[in-house]
């Protein structure tokens, strides 16, 4: 994610374009990746990039360190990487580079794919091709001691205005974005069905939960400036990640936040305590006068007088 051209947004952008190009997607998730990595295969992959014997020795010892169970029982580790280990994600990515990436290049020529950690997508021309690839994936991962997650691995039809095949699954989630058919407008203002990415339902639910956790209505000892300083860094982060594609998906988050700010006004000022409409109008006037105060207000998500 820190390499140029390899960020999550790069992966989303590439996936969007491929979904427009290919009608079918095979999405897969590896079940318990970190617990099931084969040590011998991992060390073989590592030796392709490192010849320093003492370093290889330390990595191998670190992989095999015993686990102390809750009851004090010592259990030998025969596979997997230590939970929470700082280099576990790096080693897992190296492992999958050879187990999946190189395998796909060799065995699936011409098939576009994208993998981010243990989540991956392969784009197909037809349903029979997608079914064959899903079967090949299942066999490949079993070959190296891994298993694709049965509940998170599917074939998806990328439905839009020009694709009207009836299929039971027409959406998937990747890197916090839901890819699904959405209503869009063209340059003439005409509505049409498009297959695109937007903040996932799970991500929106999590953002709303964060807003609820802030308990803004109970912070009536704070000024509105203090609230803005407290939450703006988080709002900026949400928008910079999820607002990159289909910004409209975030409108429910911003509306939810405005409702909490309105409740804050009602708790802070007695004259508005039982008058939600008046509290909303008061907040709307502040938004007009100080559009820069809250990050989402700058984006145009303000209350109306």
Q: Whereabouts are the PLM-identified features?
A:
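Conserved polymerase palm-domain catalytic core
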Residues: 1-159, 171
């Amino acid at each position: 994610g820190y390499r140029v051209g390899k960020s999550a947004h790069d992966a989303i952008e590439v996936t969007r374009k491929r979904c427009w190009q290919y009608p079918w997607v095979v999405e897969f998730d590896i079940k318990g990746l970190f617990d099931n990595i084969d040590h011998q295969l991992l060390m073989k992959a590592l030796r392709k990039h490192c010849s320093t014997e003492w370093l290889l020795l330390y990595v191998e010892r670190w992989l095999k360190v015993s686990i102390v169970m809750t009851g004090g029982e010592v259990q030998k580790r025969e596979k997997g990487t230590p939970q929470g280990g700082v280099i576990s994600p790096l080693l897992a990515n190296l492992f999958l580079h050879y187990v999946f990436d190189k395998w796909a290049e060799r065995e699936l020529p011409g098939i576009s794919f994208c993998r981010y950690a243990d989540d991956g997508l392969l784009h197909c021309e037809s349903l029979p091709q997608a079914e064959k690839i899903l079967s090949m994936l299942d066999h490949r991962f079993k070959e190296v001691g891994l298993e694709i997650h049965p509940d998170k691995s599917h074939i998806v039809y990328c439905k839009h205005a020009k694709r009207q095949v009836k299929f039971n699954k027409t959406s998937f989630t990747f890197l916090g974005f839901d890819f699904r058919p959405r209503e869009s407008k063209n340059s003439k203002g005409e509505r049409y069905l498009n297959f695109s990415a937007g903040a996932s339902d799970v991500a929106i639910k999590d953002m709303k939960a964060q807003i609820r956790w802030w308990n803004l209505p109970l912070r009536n000892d704070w000024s509105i400036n203090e609230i803005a300083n407290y939450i703006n860094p988080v709002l900026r982060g949400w928008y910079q990640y999820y607002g990159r594609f289909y910004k409209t998906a975030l409108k429910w988050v911003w509306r939810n936040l405005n409702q909490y700010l309105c409740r804050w006004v009602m708790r802070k000022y007695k004259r508005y305590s039982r008058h939600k409409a008046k509290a909303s109008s008061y907040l709307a006037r502040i938004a007009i006068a100080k559009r820069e105060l809250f990050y989402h207000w700058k984006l145009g998500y303000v209350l109306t007088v």
